[in-house]
Amino acid sequence: MKRNLLYAIVVVLIVIAIGAAVYYYFATVPAPGSEVIKVALVLPGSKSDHGWSQSAFEGLMAAKKKYDIEVDYTEYVLPPEAGDVIRDYCEKGYKLIIVHDFLAKDAVLAAAADYPDIYFCYPTGMDLRTNVASYWSWNHETSYLAGMLAAGLTNSSKVGVYAAVQIPTIVCCLESFKLGVKEMAEELGKTVEIYEAYTGTFEDVAKGYEAVETFASYRADVVYGTGDGINVGGMEAARTYGVYFIGGCGDQHPLDPEKVIASCDWGGEEMICDIIGKFLNGTLQGNVKYEYTLGGGIGPHFAKYYEDIAPEELVQRINETEQAILNGTKTIPKYTEPGSVDP
């Protein structure tokens, strides 16, 4: 009797184990022909610009590897062309389309209205929809550190800063850079003149060259630039005129290891991978701004290559300030109006 009972219990346990294994298999292994998640990225520039476009491309590739999804991308898409590129991805079954260009906003919103079952994301967006979210990389903190560096390194007591257009996430870079220059200069007991400019474009190499050339004519010897093609031109001018250059948008040191002494990296790789992860786990929501900061731990960071040329005291002071930002004991104001800080 006991033997029969034991046998029955063993049989029941085996059946339960087999059932659980079968359930787990079908719950975790995609059925043949099941839908593959497709994510597209539309870039305004080159995937190898060491800036805004490349960092986003690397985020897409990181997400592809991490989540085993199907991805595609298109480079050099100007705003007038963005609508056709976006709609082509919609027709091809892409479920998340990231348009990495604020200036393509109108094309994004128009497509979102016609394809309500597809999610769209674009940077620095305030005009959102139920299927449109935006991501914001705030670099006021890293730009403040760049300002400290410029003030500490300049021998002429003249520095320059330029960017593309006056949108909040870019304006805050210029204003915080100026604040960092002024406060570090005051700490060092000197006065530093600041020259600033907006080029009106992200990609025009000549405009970046002209900005740095103009600053150099005023004897500025350290320049901070934020952009893609405009920074390629800015770095070329920095080489020509012997100016130290602080990159922006991505880590641009590899483009000119001699002249690029630091970069305010906007953290596009981590940011884009995070946005895709949110979409895949069901937490990405329309009508939401996803914001990333140095203190937030995902996205922006300050890439440093100046230890061999900067005074030890300056290096230490910048490191202390960065740590204070990270642990929350120092807050850098987020100025989004041009002229908030006098040059």
Give each language-model segment a name.
Residues 2-6, 31-343:
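A residue-level marker of the well-folded mature domains of exported/periplasmic proteins
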Residues 1-34:
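Secretory targeting signatures
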